Every structure is written in C-alpha cells, then in structure tokens.
Amino acid sequence: MYVTHIDTEKHMHTQHKAVKEVELINTLPLSQSYFKGSRNTPLTNNTIGAYFDFIVDKNPNSLAVVVNHQNIRLTYKEFQKEVNQLAMGLLAIGVKPGDRVGIWSPNNIQWCLTQFATAKIGAIMVCINPAYRPNELQYALNSVECSTLITASQFKGSNYIDMLNSLAPELKHCDNGKLSAQALPSLKM
C-alpha cells in the first residue's frame, strides 16, 4: 500500500516541486499504521462512544444530525437516546464486542445510528455497498464473517429483502436470532 501526502504550506509556491514530492512519496511503501509526530491536537484515549457521550454532555441541545431526505433533525441528546436504544437492542439480540455487524443501506438516519451504536458496544460496523447484488452481498458477508445484518428494505429500485430471501430462503422461516443459512454461515441475526 502506498500513501500520498503533500505539505501544502511547504509547497504552496512551487507546484512543480510539489508534484515531484508526490511522485517520490508514491514510490515509498506504507510501513506504519500509526504516524507519530507533533500535532496541535493531542490524541485521546477515549473510545468513540465515550467521546460521543462527552460531546452530548457539553452540547445536549445543539443540532447533531440533519437528514434532509428523511426530514429528520436531531439534537445531540435526541440522537444519543436513539443510539443508546439501538445499542441496547443489539446487545439484547446477542451482539457482543468484536462481532461484525453489517449495514446494507444508503446514507440515512439508520446508518448514522448503527455507526454510533456499534461503536458504543464495541462491535465492528461493516459497510456493505448499497449497490451490491446478491452474489456480492454473499461474498462481503462471508469474507468478514458478519453475524448480524441491518438493512434497508429497498433503495432505488433494489429490493434488499427480496435479494436476501433469494440468497437465503431460510430467512422466511427462522426464529429471531437463530438464522442458519447455508449461503451465509456466519449470519445469525
């Protein structure tokens, strides 16, 4: 994997030099997942969930989320309430820290809630491309071993429920939390 970085202040006056810098950096392999160096803002040891709660405490009545196409506007306190409800629901159906929770959905409030709810409980949110067809969905879910899938019912002419049922007909007859689908062996909920 390679990384591209341009120090814009350093190379603002000399575009040609900046291009050479990018070419040079593109030839260097990425060898660190963490880059250590001085920063204006120090790193925090908080989790996303803990930091979110901290922000909510500081700004409970400030606007946090606007989803125009769903006509939704939530303050931080309202958004936190919804996030906590989803987090508790995920825990209640058996999602544990480290579990992979897939979301197969376009950008919407449910996607935002899932992002923060999974972070709060220590689950790993797996974003599934909303344009995926059944074979691509099967590959994605099986590759990362998703145990849970949250999905929209449909989007832009794609009926996600029908596609899931075609891939795993067992969905129609399973009990909640007890899915056993041959095509999706790790999916349980």
Which residues are covered by each model-predicted region?
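Flexible, non-catalytic linker and terminal segments flanking ANL/adenylate-forming cores
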Residues: 1-46
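Structural core segment of the AMP-binding/adenylate-forming
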Residues: 2-19, 121-189
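AMP-dependent adenylate-forming
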Residues: 26-32, 51-75
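Short, flexible loop segments at the rims of nucleotide/cofactor-binding pockets, characterized by
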Residues: 40-43, 78, 126-129
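Conserved AMP-binding/adenylate-forming core of the ANL superfamily
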Residues: 44, 61-116, 133-138
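Hydrophobic alpha-helical segments typical of transmembrane helices
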Residues: 47, 51-52, 136
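Aromatic/hydrophobic pocket-lining residues that form π-stacking "cages" and hydrophobic walls in ligand
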Residues: 52, 114, 164
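A generic structural signal for well-ordered alpha-helical segments
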Residues: 55-56, 118, 141
